[in-house]
Amino acid sequence: MASEEASLRALESLMSEFFHNGTSNERKREIESLLNNFAQQLGAWRFCFYFLSQSQNDYVLMYSLSVFENMINKMWLGVPSQEKMEIRNSLPKLLLSQHKSLPSFICNKLCKVIVDMGRQDWPMFYHDFFTNILQLIQTPSTTPLGLIMLKTASEELACPREDLIVARKEELRKLLLEQVPTVLDLLTGVLESIWDKHSITAATPPPSPTASDTDDLLSNLIHTPNLTKQLSQPPPSLEAESERVCALALECLSHLFSWIPLSASITPSLLTTIFQFARLGCDARSRQTNSVTTNTTASVVNGRSSSPPTAPARDLARLGVLAMSCINELMCKNCVPLEFQEYLLRVCQQTFYLLQRITRETNAHSVRSRFEELDESYVEKFTDFLRLFVSVHLRRIESNAQFPLLEFLTLLFKYTFHQPTREGYLSCLDIWAQFLDYLTNKIRNRLEDRDAIIGRYEDALVLLLNEVLNRIQFRYNQTQLEELDDETLDDDQQTEWQRYLRHSLEVVAKIMDLLPTHAFSKLFAALQENLNVYLGLQRCLVTNGNDQRLNVTAENDCRRLHCSLRDLSSLLQAVGRLAEYFIGDMFGARFNDALTVVERLVEVTLYGSRIKLYNMETAVPSVLKPDLIDVHAQSLAALQAYSHWLARYYSEVQRQNPEQFISIISTAMEALPPLISTKVQEKLLLSACHLLVSIATTVRPMFLLNIPSVQKVFSRVTDSSAQRLPEEAQVLLCRALSNVLLLPWPNVPEGEQQWAERSSHHSNLLNALTRDYRLLKGSSLPQRKGQLEATKRVICQTLGVLRDIVENISGEGTKSRQICYQSLQESAQLSLTLFPAYIHQSDVTEEMLSFFLALFQGLRVQMGAPFTEQIIQTFLNMFTREQLAESILQEGSAGCHVVEKFLKILQVVVQEPGQSFKPFLPSILSLCMEQLYPIIAERPSPDVKAELFELLFQLLHHNWRYFYRSSVLASVHRDGSDEPMENQAQFIVVMQAFGQSFLQPDIHIFRQNLSYLETLNSKHKLYHKKLFQTGMLPQFVSVLLQVLIHKSHDLLQEEIGIAVYNMASVDFSTFFSTFLPEFLTGCQGLDTSQKSVLARNFKMERDLPSFTQSVHRLVNDLRYYRLCNDSLPPGTVKL
């Protein structure tokens, strides 16, 4: 090697060149290779130590530390003991001497490298590692440095990465736990000393004008006078350096709390100190523009930067954020030892004192203005605390006499409804939802105490209901609600407004469950008020010839109307959301309320359809027209929500006095025909269609087809001259009309169902719907493009409607399915005839196969064996290897979808319990394994694979006797592994395909196929079968272990471990004595002694938890040994 000085200059030059904008990628790769080779040389660390002590180049310093890091984590095993000792002595000295001059990120990296040494050698060879950290903290000049070391040690030693053997990980955690009491005492001392030092100099404040209110609440929340006094002291004025030390100490505590168990080491003194700092977030007087990060390390030990003598308010707020992080780490622990219950109460009491401080009003500040001054991160942390308290600990605290829950709810109410941000408000609503769930579950478990429980909380629930309802109404909250986006969809397909409304209505619904009478009367009163405005609009209509105009023109009137319409739309959604609370056991008790709602909704829907407000000219069309459309759509949707109530109502009055029910249904149906039109906005059209579907499917009144308005809809759909509706509306309407004719009427004897008449009507309906499609009979594939596209459109539209009709009656009785098949039999046969002609048109083929899939799933019996066999044979003949390849390999996904649909049909076929389809099994297996599997086996894309493997699984699962014919009795008397087998070659090929799939990268296929094997084992003892046990099981176990070792499917560690256990449990003795040694013998990259250690550490225990723990230990340690061995220089001797 060259001299150290020359090497340093060369390295600096290379680094400058590497990071220069003009350096090519090829040259960068050359430099990278050169640097890697240098790092692998024996003794390179000495040069790197020289570079660290002499260079001012950040790139050089970072590279030098990375050499040390790589050596310690990967090559330490082969480093001579004397050199290790030199490194252990020299690096801490370097850190101590230069930490004030080094850039902060370099200093942090150096700390990490030293901790890595401790991770390897403490306490045996580096006995003073942790002692040195404690000494650094105790020395004022190095306290920040010691805290960085401590936090790094907690991060790297308590939860180490994969590059340590399991035994060492366990040892490190145990060693650290032994140090926890000392560390916590030390950190408590650091924080207390700084707080006390600066509190002495803090001025005594004048008495607060609201002091008496504060004291009253404190006396309820905190029953310890000294604690009350401590928390009421004014906050200290910290120096900048002291603020940094406190921030680091709190970061250390936060990380420690994330992994140490709750115990007496977390003393009342420490908790009080943390809360002292948490107060600082409440007292902040300036709001940060950027969110605070909890990693303050970067700014702590940077000696190059100068700091003001006193920390600004935002830095004090940061301490409040960090302190709340500590508290939340404690709160998220669900397992609370009995001896820690008192501490938990103390934590809650102290935090609610802070909640009171946040929500108090003074002469100078309203609650909202106080919130706007607080740091956003602090408010988020505080909301997290409240969520954890309610979801995890409320059940522990509620019954404690020292905890005033009602006062807490008062503070939570103020906290919720003064949130400065929408996200903050919605997070608080989630907390209330959790509280309401808690109350509901408590009442269900103690029904005899229902009145007492609700009585205790009734006032709070009433306040909450009123405020939530006000918050969703433009009348009270227009400015904030107008800001919500109602156009852009998020990942859940909701707009901002829809998400806000949904959150709010969920809370309203939960209150309705607890206070049904009050909630309903409050909501219905608000609905009535806005309905009166809407229904009164007919007085403002001005007619001009055939056109009508809404004569509301004054700006203020338009604004008020806009607010009222938006509120009516929201309240209609609320009423629909509450429909579930009027059915079931509550039907009788709440009947009158529900009837009032339904009658009002029917009135509103008919009113909207009659005067066609959605088509009116308005003074502000961009605002009022969407409002009017939405109100009408929501009234239809709200009425649809009551379809289950209507069904129950129908069953109650069907035999006596049905007049009122008939009137409701007839009036509701009268609102639909004007909306079934291409001229009506699609939102309204679809709402009308959905309502008709619900009435036809859920309510099923036997008089529905006799209603003139329903007959109008029937005529509209079957009229060939009428313009076709949009596809979704057309499908929904056809479904509704088909269901009217096919679904049995409730509570009507079979002999009175009028099946003959309904069958005739259904046949006419489908004849009308398939008129154009049936004209294709006998025709060939059109050659002209325009004609071909028109024909394809007819096929796809018709089969789409027919498929939907079939899918919707697939679970119904035999008679409904018989009538359905009779009506579409001609179309089904025509589809099979046309199929070969359109085999190369992927979109048409997919629609045809979807239709046949629906037939197989819903009408298989009605089709009869000859026709189903004809369909299967046609498909098997058409899907040759060439056709499969063409479909799968074509651009886009349409071709793959065709093959997937075909495989889904075969899945239905192989699950058929009878004997009719058994002759097809050899052909299906041949198609799968000889024609399809070779095409997709090596393709990285998961397309088709999932469906193919599901088909293979279903074939094995439902046709096990195709391979194992012996009877159940014979299996019982014979050893299960010795059953005679048939079709062995096909079975082996299928199992090999499953095994091959575990070598592929797709995790979904892996998970699916692993679960299939486990199911076959649990149902058919697959792993115990002689063929599998002797010829396949070792390979499967080996592949699964290799997958774990290579970490290619880490998300499935648990599932893989269980599968390995189930395979090994077939014969544990063979696994331990034969498989494990052979597996380790075949493992590359390990020496003989390491293999022996791995075998010795694998405990021969046969219960699932112990076995899987041994598997994961084996995998972890094997990976670690390989990592070390791969990084050792050639010729290394390991002792």
Curated annotation (Swiss-Prot):
GO terms, molecular function: nuclear export signal receptor activity; small GTPase binding
Main location: nucleus
Cellular component GO terms held in the UniProt record: cytoplasm; nucleus
UniProt cross-references to Gene3D superfamilies, sorted A to Z: Leucine-rich Repeat Variant
SMART domains reported for this sequence: IBN_N
Compartments where found: Nucleus; Cytoplasm
Domain of life, per lineage: Eukaryota
Boundaries of every Importin N-terminal domain copy: 31-97
A Pfam family hit: IBN_N
Protein's GO biological process: protein export from nucleus
Stated family: Belongs to the exportin family.
Name of the protein: Exportin-6-A
Organism of provenance: Xenopus laevis (African clawed frog)
Protein encoded by which gene: xpo6-a
